[in-house]
A protein has these predicted regions:
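Short active-site neighborhood of thiol/selenol oxidoreductases, capturing the structured segment around
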Residues: 44-65, 71
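A short beta-strand-turn-helix
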Residues: 31-51
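Structural microenvironment flanking redox-active thiols in thiol-disulfide oxidoreductases
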Residues: 65-103, 118-120
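Thiol-/selenol-based redox modules, centered on thioredoxin-like
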Residues: 128, 136-161
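Short, small/polar residue-rich loop motifs at catalytic or cofactor-binding pockets
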Residues: 27, 50, 127-129
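Bacterial Sec-dependent N-terminal signal peptides
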Residues: 1-25, 161
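Short, internal strand/loop/helix patches
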Residues: 101-129, 133
């Protein structure tokens, strides 16, 4: 009986903690990233009334690379989405990722580093990459993923945005 009570209290605690995290990320974080063109970008650069997908990633993460390839392959589903890819790695790695994946061909994708500020990392409490947060056209959270979902699920949420 004690084990059951302990398990139930653990489930409730984890559930409440998770609910608090979702409530705390309802808005787009106040970030400042250095993009691949050596320009600093902030949320002020985002277009109004257009949905946003923030992806916290690492250029050398195989799951992140796979996600990028899948998004590129389904770009027709993501073309109206502003995609902001943020990392804490060195600028040279960001530049390499940008070039390797031909991101210059996709004007709706911004890739940048937050350097050692870790503001976005801490805002989302990122534990693994890629971390994805999708915001609607009013820039309010629709869905957050702690790991990459299937591209079909991601595309379906993007359509709702």
């Amino acid at each position: 009986m004690k084990k059951i009570l302990f398990f139930l209290s653990l489930v409730i605690t984890v559930g409440c903690t998770r609910a608090q995290n979702v409530a705390s990320i309802q808005n787009i974080p106040d970030y400042r990233i250095l993009d691949a063109d050596s320009v600093y970008r902030t949320p002020a650069n985002l277009k109004k009334n257009q949905p946003v997908m923030i992806v916290y990633f690492s250029p050398d993460c195989s799951h992140c690379q796979h996600l990028m390839n899948e998004i590129k392959g389904q770009m027709k589903n993501f073309s109206k989405m502003q995609i902001v890819m943020v990392s804490a790695v060195d600028y040279r790695m960001i530049k390499g990722f940008y070039k390797d994946f031909g991101i210059a061909a996709y004007p709706n994708i911004t890739v940048g580093t937050e350097g050692n500020t870790y503001k976005v990392l801490q805002y989302y409490n990122v534990k693994t990459t890629p971390y994805i947060a999708i915001y609607n056209h009013r820039h309010k959270l629709l869905k957050a993923y702690e790991k990459a979902p299937k591209i079909e699920e991601l595309a379906a949420i993007v359509k709702k945005a």
